[in-house]
């Protein structure tokens, strides 16, 4: 997505959202976003979270480049492009972008890229911690992720107990 600073200089914002829990993973503004910057963002996210299985993107020039395609092939990431003119194929990202535009880009007049990124970081934190999603049972991305982790831990604990009980010798009664 794009906007402009108060001096008219154009900026681009790259948003990366986790499809599972709608968490904003990357919200960053630059004067331009060539594919090298997208790759650098993915490399930073790889260090923090590991590699994604799939990335769904629109058909912007930064996403249709050979460099990004080659990077994804090397890393074993499925790079999926939505059909041109069908933003509904990426509806939750479009909704995210609408909230971001309303809450950040339309709400402030920025004088520098640094100012944009300071607000981006604050907004991303608030969004992940406090923004409820109907698809997540009206939980924030953070609350949903915590609930999911607890369920996984509980499920693994139950499985471990079941395995232990199946492996313990059977009790027999002698007469």
Residue ranges and their predicted role:
Residues 1-4, 15:
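Two-metal-ion RNase H-like nuclease active-site motif
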Residues 23-24:
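Hydrophobic "anchor" residues
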Residues 73-77, 99-175:
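C-terminal domain-tail junction helix/linker
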């Amino acid at each position: 997505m794009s906007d402009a600073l108060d001096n008219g200089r154009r900026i681009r914002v790259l948003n990366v959202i986790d499809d599972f829990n709608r968490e904003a993973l990357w919200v960053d503004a630059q004067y331009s976003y060539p594919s090298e910057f997208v790759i650098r963002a993915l490399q930073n996210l790889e260090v923090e979270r590991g590699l994604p299985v799939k990335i769904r993107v629109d058909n912007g020039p930064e996403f249709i480049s050979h460099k990004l395609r080659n990077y994804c092939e090397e890393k074993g990431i499925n790079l999926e492009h939505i059909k041109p003119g069908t933003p509904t194929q990426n509806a939750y990202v479009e909704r995210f972008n609408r909230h971001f535009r309303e809450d950040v880009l339309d709400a402030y007049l920025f004088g520098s890229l640094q100012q944009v990124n300071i607000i981006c970081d604050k907004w991303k934190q608030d969004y992940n911690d406090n923004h409820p999603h109907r698809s997540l049972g009206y939980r924030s991305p953070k609350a949903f992720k915590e609930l999911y982790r607890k369920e996984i831990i509980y499920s693994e604990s139950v499985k471990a107990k079941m395995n232990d009980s199946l492996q313990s010798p059977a009790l027999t009664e002698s007469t």
